[in-house]
């Protein structure tokens, strides 16, 4: 396969002045089906720097937002140092060893010494050429955790517009030709130990939904996709939160499900509280998703003893918290108090629920009952960490480590490691899957990978 290599750097100067059918979109973080893509014979099983790479794009700056896809458009964000010199990245092994020794703290902060430029890119899906790039904001922000980025929120699209949320700046909307349609400013808010932000927006109908939980004033809100005007807003008692909300279309109604340090809260599309429960870990990153008519929620901060997974039935009302010692009730179909993962969201593929722990452990349970199918299995060797969420297609489970190695496993009731695909680059972003291709973001490149 021919590799096309393109650089985005050449356009930075110009920017400063301004299921069965083919799956053609991946419109938000983890797509619409919790990381599961429709089977396609050209979706890749194996790849490497010179194998099955359709194109590779150099991405200036830093950003851990995931790419999204709409037809022939691939969107992603980055933050570029205006000096042209990026802050050196510490060796990945340093972060990994510290993560194993204990959670990182507020001492692990970096503060920019020069203004940064927040950038939205539109990359041509077929060729990898940069269709356009827009500078959204230029400023010198406050400190953040060294391992996070100032562009960690994944954009969202409805096929007509692309929406970008920047936790330090606000909401933006562009049409697919790169014209800015609106901007709704938001003030930066203090996050736990200065770790920065990551919760992404989601689109449903003519509204954009957002959760902004911080140490100051937390809230959930809906915005008009055409104008950016606020439709409703609800103040929340949650502390800092990095989880993306989920639109749950079930057999009873459509809900906006939010998770956080205080618990789970679900609202109707007009912001009215529906149901909730306590019992989450103190820091929450993973995003809810649905499969088999159930809502799956996992929460697993590594320093907490409570690291639960829940499977929720539709139709709940009010407080559905579990009594101490109980694992189910009328609406909690099953739960497990120690199964949750910290950074990666869980995956349900076929009849099985897969938990990928940050330390490279995969655990499989029956998705409908919670019964263990197989216990902890070591995916990786050598202590590498996993931040990106797993994904699945063609009867296989994929998990990409922070080292850029993707581990390919057979889906089903028995664990089998089929192979490893190395890109040899630091990787924290969850890939997108569309048009028979895997779109992978690393610390400095964007890849389109396919066996076409």
Which sequence ranges carry the predicted segments?
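Noncatalytic, solvent-exposed loop/strand surfaces
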Residues: 20-452
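Positively charged n-region of N-terminal signal peptides that target proteins for export
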Residues: 1-6
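Bacterial N-terminal signal peptides
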Residues: 7-17
């Amino acid at each position: 396969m021919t590799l096309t290599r393109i650089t985005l750097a050449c356009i930075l100067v110009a920017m400063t002045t301004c299921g069965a059918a083919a799956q053609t979109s991946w419109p938000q973080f983890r797509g619409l089906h919790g990381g599961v893509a429709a089977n396609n014979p050209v979706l890749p099983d194996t790849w490497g720097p010179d194998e099955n790479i359709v194109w590779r794009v150099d991405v200036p700056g830093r950003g851990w937002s995931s790419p999204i896809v709409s037809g022939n458009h691939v969107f992603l964000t980055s933050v570029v140092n205006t000096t042209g010199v990026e802050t050196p990245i510490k060796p990945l092994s340093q972060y990994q060893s510290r993560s194993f020794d204990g959670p990182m703290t507020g001492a692990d902060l970096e503060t920019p010494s020069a203004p940064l430029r927040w950038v939205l890119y539109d990359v041509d899906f077929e060729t990898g050429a940069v269709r356009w790039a827009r500078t959204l904001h230029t400023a010198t922000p406050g400190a953040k955790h060294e391992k996070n980025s100032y562009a960690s929120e994944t954009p969202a699209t409805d096929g007509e517009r692309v929406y970008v949320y920047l936790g330090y700046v606000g909401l933006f909307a562009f049409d697919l030709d790169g014209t800015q349609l609106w901007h709704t400013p938001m003030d930066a808010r203090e996050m736990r130990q200065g770790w920065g932000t990551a919760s992404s927006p989601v689109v449903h109908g003519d509204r954009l939904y957002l959760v902004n939980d911080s140490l100051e004033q937390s809230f959930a809100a809906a915005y008009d996709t055409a104008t950016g005007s606020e439709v409703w807003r609800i103040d929340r008692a949650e502390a800092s939160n990095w989880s993306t909300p989920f639109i749950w279309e079930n057999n009873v109604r459509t809900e906006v499900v939010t998770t956080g340090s205080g618990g789970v809260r679900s609202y109707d599309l007009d912001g009215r509280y529906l149901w909730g429960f306590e019992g989450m870990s103190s820091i929450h990153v993973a995003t809810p998703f649905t499969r088999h008519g159930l809502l799956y929620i996992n929460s697993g901060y590594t320093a907490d003893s409570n690291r639960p997974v829940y499977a929720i039935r539709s139709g709940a009302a009010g407080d559905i918290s579990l009594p101490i010692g109980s694992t189910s009730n009328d609406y909690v179909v099953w739960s497990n108090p120690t199964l949750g993962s910290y950074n990666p969201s869980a995956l349900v593929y076929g009849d099985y629920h897969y938990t990928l722990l940050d330390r490279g452990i995969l655990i499989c349970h029956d998705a409908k009952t919670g019964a263990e199918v197989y216990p902890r299995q070591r995916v990786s060797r050598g202590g590498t960490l996993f931040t990106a969420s797993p994904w699945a297609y063609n009867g296989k489970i994929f998990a990409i480590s922070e080292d850029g190695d993707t581990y390919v496993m057979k889906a089903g009731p028995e664990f089998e490691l089929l192979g490893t695909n190395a890109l040899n680059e630091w990787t924290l972003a969850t890939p997108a899957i569309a048009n028979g291709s895997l779109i992978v973001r690393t610390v400095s490149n964007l890849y389109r990978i396919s066996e076409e």
